Amino acid sequence: MRNILPFLTRIPVKGDFEKARNELWAFPLVSLVSSIIPIAILYLRIPLANVLALLSLYFVIGLLHLDGLADWADGIMVKGDRERKIKAMKDLNTGIAGVFAVVVVLFLQVYSLSMLPFYAIYIAELNSKFSMLLGLATKKPLGQGLGAYFMEGMNGRQLAIGVVLYVLLYLPVVIYDPSALFGVMGLVFAWYVIRLSLENFGGINGDCLGAMAEITRAGTLVILSFSLCFTT
């Protein structure tokens, strides 16, 4: 897992670029690292815990995925053919669609966390990291960037190990609180982003993966919030 950490977090560890694509199966494991501080903040219920938990999460994982979400949203929303959409996504200037997407995702996360138990951020992060693994499993790269490089190393074995890890990491939370199982539905957002990416761009790049991570995390928290309303 050490080699994949520099690509998914800001943790100052030295990873081997060549070996990283052989550790894609470890994506779900990264959620243990990225969510530990937010979990502690939410568990202690300190003032503004929902805001501080989210800030601490982005302190660990960085803002690269949020930037990818903004670029992805600009590309999705622009009118025109596939070439024009890809050009808009790669534009260095962030458009109104990108700004709107980032604001909505942040708002949904902050508001949802104020209603949810401490472990919700862990489930959301687990889904977030697993969604990127699912995106890589499509083996449909867009361009020759980091996403394409990782897809070259993606295979059935890595996906199978990743799925097993996802289940094993999710299971303890379900044992603790069976209602946490509703969080699995958050993966529907991953599927939707993958579908939109393939339909609009014809492939998946780093921006698409970032959008998957952010939208899946926010969507999972929203689903858990609604499930809480119906189960209490």
UniProtKB/Swiss-Prot annotation:
Cofactor needs: Mg(2+)
Catalytic EC class: transferase
Family that this chain belongs to: Belongs to the CobS family.
Keyword entries, A-Z: Cell membrane, Cobalamin biosynthesis, Magnesium, Membrane, Transferase, Transmembrane, Transmembrane helix
Parts of the chain that traverse the membrane: 24-44, 46-66, 96-116, 117-137, 153-173, 174-194, 210-230
Record-given protein name: Adenosylcobinamide-GDP ribazoletransferase
Organism: Pyrococcus abyssi (strain GE5 / Orsay)
One Gene Ontology term, aspect cellular component: plasma membrane
GO molecular function: adenosylcobinamide-GDP ribazoletransferase activity; cobalamin 5'-phosphate synthase activity
